[in-house]
């Protein structure tokens, strides 16, 4: 078995920059829908899933301003539609994040089932059970 052997004895000093985590950022972005306040979210990874989710959110009326590659300013006060287009959702698995946020704020969400995954089947049945347990009526259509 390989191992690292580290001999200390010297004080450590310096800085480490930690980049944002994609899955945490997806949930945080969706949660920002819940408030009508303007929200600044920093330390976002610059990856496809984040960018597609932001596009999907813009398509339903969320105002998104890219401040830097890793920061956005968002305002969800003017969401005009709770139906997210399949063209966005087929590219990512994060659609279920939007379901919870839209249900929480508007008591309704029309969101296609998630796509974007080559890992294999990862159903969202536990999310659906949770929505039902909280009183939502869930209808799955083809």
Where in the sequence are the language-model features?
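Structural preference for solvent-exposed beta-strand-turn elements
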Residues: 1-142
């Amino acid at each position: 078995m390989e191992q690292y052997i580290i001999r200390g004895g010297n004080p450590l000093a310096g800085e480490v920059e930690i980049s944002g985590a994609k899955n945490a950022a997806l949930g945080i972005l969706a949660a920002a829908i819940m408030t009508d306040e303007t929200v600044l979210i920093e330390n976002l990874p610059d990856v496809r899933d984040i960018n597609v989710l932001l596009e999907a959110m813009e398509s339903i009326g969320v105002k998104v301003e890219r401040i830097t590659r890793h920061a956005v300013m968002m305002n969800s006060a003017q969401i005009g539609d709770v139906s997210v287009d399949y063209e966005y959702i087929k590219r990512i698995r994060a659609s279920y994040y939007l379901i919870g946020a839209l249900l929480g704020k508007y008591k309704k969400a029309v969101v296609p089932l998630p796509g974007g995954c080559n890992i294999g089947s990862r159903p969202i049945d536990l999310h659906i059970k949770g929505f039902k347990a909280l009183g939502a009526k869930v209808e799955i259509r083809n």
